[in-house]
């Protein structure tokens, strides 16, 4: 179809949304004026400014644009919504570098405590949740937003549902990250690991996440392809389960609607159980199911091979969905949690090893007949190595959930090494590979600016990961053995400070590994930036000649 005429009038939806954000800005100004503490006043003022900026953007977009609602097709081609994907891709790299940098800082603080600088906002206690949230939710979350919006459009051959809704999701999510992150630095926290944001940030995330679910679901419902590709099943499981986890773990009663402090509804062992039901399944569905969707789409696309076994991918999906949700109690071994609950969590954790390795095998065997591409394509190599790290982490996790093993590993640096094998090796590498694929596609470039830089990124980051996790494995096992060592008289052989001193060289090695990983991400950011800036545009083929997505 031909391009529509220019429309400068606001739609009913745009008018309503602009009015809603104008009212929100007014209420936030009142909240800032009546705030009981400085952090709440800052966040209320920040929200007022952001709301007014949204109103301005809605009004501004009405000028010099095609018809009020974008056409579903232009000249016979699906008119895909790429703006939100570009925004999330950019924010993923921004938050990734920020999160890796903060991680390097806190790793250095453990090796050299003077780097805390005796300032509250530079202390380890405030920077650590900033690091985890920036890497997991800001970097990882934006990668998932960008890839899910791309994959669901391409595999369904239809534009994203809604006009402003996808933009609300990506902008609203990143504003939530900004509120949560600045809150940590100001001392605003629920003190629940991976669920630190206070009540008003949680409310914002709830609204954004429900909108995300609706956009994704409606896009699938109006698809033009009869089959729902398996990656969309994994994305949908991730979105739905994170919503349930967020609502279950974060009910809280604010001390005042004009203050940042709240009290969580649960207490005691119930709170601990809810927390690690949430914490473990945040790993299981945010850091596993969502990124498995990336694996199932991007590895076949990059390798130009079909998924090794589509049937195995369906078995992998349902087994993972059923088993993962029950495994949380293994985080609470040797605590006040009832013993039968600990054993149940351990049992499901061990069972989880089988579907996890089924998915790993499916991802690796997709390269059947294309293994030679690993020599020439560093992006594919990065994606495949991420699957190997996934297999390693999903073997180590069930092993560490066994009570006998956990009696040594619990509370030690071994757990830190395990987490980062998954976070850096699996999540990091599959995210990097996805962005290396996605940016040229979305910005319509023939390829990346430099494959040689991708190769440098791969080897530098791999060396960083090996240094990091090896140091933490050795440190953790040494730590556990020193804690449980007794003299012939039955006294502890080592004082606590002696165990801390023994960790010092390993903490230096960890910081070095983290520094290398950060350098790799900076190389990637430069490569992607140059791809967008100077990359050669790709000539689009007619729809009839395009390969199926």
Region spans (language model):
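Membrane-interfacial, low-structure loops and terminal tails that flank and connect transmembrane helices
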Residues: 1-9, 65-86, 370-373, 445-448, ...
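Helix-boundary and loop/linker segments of multi-pass membrane transporters
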Residues: 126-128, 266, 372-375, 414
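Membrane-interface helix termini and inter-helical loops of multi-pass transporters
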Residues: 190-193, 335-338, 406-410
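Fe-S ferredoxin-like electron-transfer domains
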Residues: 72, 197-200
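Hydrophobic cores of alpha-helical transmembrane segments in multi-pass integral membrane proteins
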Residues: 11-67, 86-188, 199-220, 232-257, ...
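Surface-exposed loop and adjacent secondary-structure segments within mature catalytic domains
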Residues: 196-197, 259-267
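Active-site-proximal inter-transmembrane loops
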Residues: 264-272, 409, 414-416
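Extended, leucine-rich alpha-helical cores of fungal transcription factors
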Residues: 227-228
